[in-house]
C-alpha cells in the first residue's frame, strides 16, 4: 500500500461572478480538503472561476442578437481570467501554502475570445499547464471558443506516499471537461499517454453522468475524479436568468452536483455528493491501475493496431 495518495474533489459554485470572492472560496475549500482529509490533490469543477452561465440566452435567436445579450457577454467576459494573471498567482500561492496540487476549471480570456479551461497548479512549480475544452456543447459555443491539440497535457507528477511517508509515488494526470468525456478519440488519446488520474470537471448533474464516469474508469483503467458544481439561484447575480422567473427563490437548485471518485475497477470510492456543497476524498492506490490493466489495456495488449490507427494532429502551441 505504499503507492497511495490522498485526493479530494470539491463540489461548489462560483461566488456570483466575483473573482475575489471565488478565489477566497477556492482557498477555503482547499484548506478544508487539506486539514480535514490530508489532500495532496484537489479537483474543482468546470468554470469554477468565471462561472457557468446556466439558463443564460445572451439575447440570442437564430439570425438575431439583442443589445442586452452583448451587455451580458461583457459582464461575463470581465469575470474571466487571463493566463498568466494575478488570479493565477493567487492560485499558485494557495497551492504552495497548502502543499496541494490544484486542478481547477476557469473561464479563460484570450483577447476577445473566451475558453472553458482547466488549469494545473503545482505547489512547487506553480502553474504548469492548461487544457482548453475542445468542443463546447450546444449554446456554450456562442460564448466559448474551441481548444486545439496543443493543450492536451498528461502531466507527470510525484507525490509523497500517503501510506509510507518518505516514499515517492509517481503518477500521470489529465483533465477532460464535461461532455468532452463523450469523445471516444479524446479519451483514447489520454489513455495512450498513460493517464492514471483522470480529472473530469463538469456541470452535468444528470444521473446518467455517474454511468459515464464509471464507464471511463473501467475503460481506461484509471481513477476518475469528477468535480461538479452545486449552485443555487443565490450563487448568481440577482438578474440572472432562471428556469421559472415567476417563482424565483434564492435556494432553488440550478446545478445539483454529483461529484464522485471512482477506482480503475469501477468501485465508487467517494460520493456521489448531491444537493449540497462539500468536499469528498479518497485514498488512491496507484497499483490499482496495474491491477486493472492485467486484463484490459485499451491502448496496449487489448488494442488492435493492425486493424485501427490513431493519430493526434497537433497544431503549433497556443499562447500560454
From Swiss-Prot:
Keywords assigned by UniProt, alphabetized: Hydrolase
Top class in the EC scheme: hydrolase
Domain CN hydrolase stretches: 5-286
Coiled coil: none
Active site: 46, 133, 178
Keyword Phosphoprotein annotated: no
GO MF: nitrilase activity
Xref: PROSITE patterns: CN_HYDROLASE
SUPFAM superfamilies cross-referenced by the UniProt entry: Carbon-nitrogen hydrolase (SSF56317)
Catalytic activity line of the entry: a nitrile + 2 H2O = a carboxylate + NH4(+)
Keyword Membrane: no
SS bond list: none
Domain of life the protein comes from: Eukaryota
A Pfam family of this chain: CN_hydrolase
Alphabetized CDD domains for the sequence: nitrilases_CHs (cd07564)
EC numbers, comma separated: 3.5.5.1
Function: Nitrilase that hydrolyzes preferentially fumaronitrile, while 3-phenylpropionitrile, beta-cyano-L-alanine and 4-cyanopyridine are transformed at much lower rates.
Protein family per UniProt: Belongs to the carbon-nitrogen hydrolase superfamily. Nitrilase family.
Protein name: Arylacetonitrilase
Originating species: Trametes versicolor (strain FP-101664) (White-rot fungus)
